[in-house]
Amino acid sequence: MTYARYACRATRLRKFLTDNDKNWVTNESGQNWIVIRYAEVLLNKAEALAMEDWNKNSVEALQALNDVRGRVGLPARATANKDTFLEYVRHERIVELAGEGFRYWDLRRWRLAEDVINGQNVHGVKITKQGDNSFTYEQVDADGGYKRIFYDRYYHFAIPLTERSNNQLCLNNEGWN
């Protein structure tokens, strides 16, 4: 089905699913929804420790990051530099939490959304099955070629009119007047 410029083609992310967990006839899975994973907790901890006081917390922050990496056999990271460490954490979040809905909110929290999002197109993938049961993958525009825009004011939400009406001293966030 297609809605305006957006297409739904029944391709789904299979992260956390195995063939044994899937009922291929009814297209259902008994897999419970994962609300929070330990890897996310460790990455949150690593980032928070580094932001609080890198000089005091660097050993514990590195340990949290390396616990996530070590779980899948990746080599440990080492750095004496807070900025380099935070780049490591950001990259690890992209890889470890892919497809879980964190990226947009991470970009907002790090105040990188304007740099990363602005001017980008939303892409999809056209998957075509070949006669030999292999597949080809083609990147396609999913939004009619429109460029994404993230304004500085989007870092903060507008305060709802009902809340401001209830309290005349409550001012809206900057950019939402």
Language-model-detected regions and their locations in the chain:
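Acidic/polar-rich alpha-helix caps and helix-coil junctions
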Residues: 1-177
